[in-house]
């Protein structure tokens, strides 16, 4: 197998596997602390998390494609401009999602079926998620950018750091 392929794919596979474990870790901590109602609440709120992550991943993937394209054409100035614009878009999107979802969260949670104690817990969980929305957009988006500039190991490290922070914050907040 091609050494370059392994160098880039193995860290990406590890990072994607760890990203998939975020929900499992949330479920373990919250399930132990809040029981079935807590698990129901994070499942109700999950589309909010998915939307924030998708926004970051989409921006980062688009930026990484443009960056790689300009680098391939030896247009360094344009490539650098794409990186700057992508970072600005992360910032704008993270703040916009915080504001819009913050305003709409109660309606969304009701639309998703939350009632009673599940609504209350889902609202609390969503507030925490929204407070970190800017970091989540940047965190999800920087991964494809790092991969496109040949830093797939750094992308994996960013994912691992995010997972450790996630475990630490959830552990402190819910145990």
Tell what function each PLM region has.
Residues 30-50, 117-121:
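Interfacial/gating helices of multi-pass transporter permease domains
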Residues 114-122, 126-127, 133-160:
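Cytoplasmic helix-loop-helix junction between adjacent transmembrane helices
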Residues 1-9, 67-134, 172-174:
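Short alpha-helical transmembrane segments in multi-pass integral membrane proteins
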Residues 12, 16, 28, 65, ...:
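Transmembrane alpha-helix boundary and packing residues in multipass membrane permease domains
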Residues 9, 16, 43-46, 90, ...:
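Residue-level recognition of transmembrane alpha-helices
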Residues 101, 154-173:
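Alpha-helical transmembrane segments of multi-pass membrane transporters
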Residues 39-99, 136-155:
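Small-residue-rich hydrophobic transmembrane alpha-helices
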Residues 2-21, 25, 48-55, 131, ...:
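Residue-level signal for short hydrophobic patches within transmembrane helices
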């Amino acid at each position: 197998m091609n050494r370059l392929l392994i160098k880039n794919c193995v860290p990406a596979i590890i990072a994607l596997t760890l990203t998939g474990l975020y929900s499992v870790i949330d479920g373990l901590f919250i399930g132990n602390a809040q029981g079935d109602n807590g698990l129901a609440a994070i499942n109700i709120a999950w589309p909010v998390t998915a939307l924030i992550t998708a926004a970051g991943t989409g921006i980062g993937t688009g930026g990484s494609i443009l960056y790689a394209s300009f680098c391939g054409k030896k247009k360094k100035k344009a490539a650098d401009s794409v990186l700057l614009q992508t970072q600005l878009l992360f910032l704008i999107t993270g703040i916009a999602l915080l504001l819009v979802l913050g305003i709409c969260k109660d309606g969304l949670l009701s639309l998703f079926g939350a009632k009673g104690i599940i609504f209350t817990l889902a609202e609390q969980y969503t507030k925490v998620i929204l407070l970190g929305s800017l970091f989540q957009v940047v965190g999800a988006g920087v991964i494809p950018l790092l991969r496109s500039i040949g830093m797939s190991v750094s992308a994996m490290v960013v994912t691992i750091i995010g997972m450790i922070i996630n475990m630490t914050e959830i552990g402190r907040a819910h145990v």
